[in-house]
A protein has these predicted regions:
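S-adenosyl-L-methionine-dependent methyltransferase catalytic module, highlighting the catalytic core
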Residues: 151-162, 169-294
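Conserved N-terminal segment of class I S-adenosyl-L-methionine
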Residues: 1-144, 153-157, 227, 240, ...
Length: 295
């Protein structure tokens, strides 16, 4: 599929990238200002229903990761770009030894301050290189909504390949952007522009096929890809189109949370099969690839 947009170019592996790409210094300055001015997406609080939603999604993805590991025992968990620390908290409760890295401690201090001692702040690539140099290995690495933010997604996945232990798993979640569905929305006039292009926050844009391609090129075997609730289906209906009418955003989010919690009443394996089918046809606002190191 061809996407003609002057802001993006197609990488040889199929994903879309910002064009031109900011320099590392420009990006560092941007995020320094971003956190200093409290412009991040972190909320001051979440409802009990939202916390249950976070836990439900973590439980589903953890179930699939554990099925691939096949050990049934907790191990070492690394969350790269751990944000507010909800994954760290969930896995610690499940008995794992947890570590997190992030550009800032703002999120973890706001939502899970008791886990701040498990988190190191700084440049993600530098922190990963330090762990590689120390021959650290992890049984499960979590990379949620991070790959799209970095200048060098190929280099990031290559580094993580050196940190996952034999038999371990890397779970990579990215927005499902540049999809055939999004182009259909634009072509039919449901959206006025490619709303999903969010520069300089998002520098790379992935679909199921391009996520699989970059994984394969960086030493990983892709075992499974699942989607999540396809909230952008609301954009085909005038009464719920949250791009044209921002006032619809909160109700769309509530519907997503309620539907996800309803699904969470079913066995995680069944829910994951449902979301794998959605991903296979290009749907799901986010997609998660479960990767194992190639021998």
């Amino acid at each position: 599929m061809t996407i003609n947009d002057s802001r993006l170019k197609r990488h040889p592996l199929g994903f879309l990238q910002a064009d031109p790409m900011p320099t590392a210094q420009e990006l560092s300055d941007y995020y320094a200002s971003y956190y200093q001015q409290e412009r991040s997406n972190y909320r001051k609080s979440y409802t009990a229903q939202e916390h249950a939603f976070f836990d439900a999604k973590l439980a589903q993805r953890a179930a699939l990761a554990e099925k691939l590991r096949g050990t049934g025992t907790p191990g070492r968990f690394l969350d790269v770009g751990c944000g507010e620390g909800f994954a760290l908290a969930w896995f610690r409760r499940a008995g794992w030894h947890v570590e997190g890295i992030d550009h800032s401690l703002a999120g973890i201090k706001a939502m899970n301050p008791d886990l701040a001692d498990a988190v190191t702040a700084g440049d993600l690539f530098g922190l990963l290189d330090t762990r590689i140099g120390a021959s650290e290995k992890y049984d499960l690495v979590w990379l949620t909504n991070v790959l799209e933010h970095v200048i060098d997604p190929v280099g990031l996945l290559e580094r993580l390949r050196r940190l996952v232990a034999p038999g371990g798993v890397l779970a990579v979640t990215v927005p499902n952007d540049g999809s055939a569905y999004q182009e259909k929305l634009l072509a039919d006039g449901h959206i006025p522009e490619r709303f999903w292009i969010a520069l300089p926050d998002h520098l790379a844009y992935f679909t199921r096929d391009s996520l699989r391609a970059i994984a394969g090129a960086t030493g990983w075997d892709c075992q499974e890809i699942i989607g999540d609730f396809p909230i952008d289906l609301f954009l085909m209906h005038d009464g719920s189109n949250y791009v044209r009418d921002r006032m619809q955003g909160a109700s769309a989010h509530r519907a997503r949370v309620e539907m996800e919690l309803l699904l969470a009443e079913q066995p995680a394996e069944a829910v994951n099969r449902f979301y794998a089918a959605l991903a296979e046809v290009g749907l799901g606002r986010n997609i998660t690839a479960f990767l194992t190191p190639r021998d």
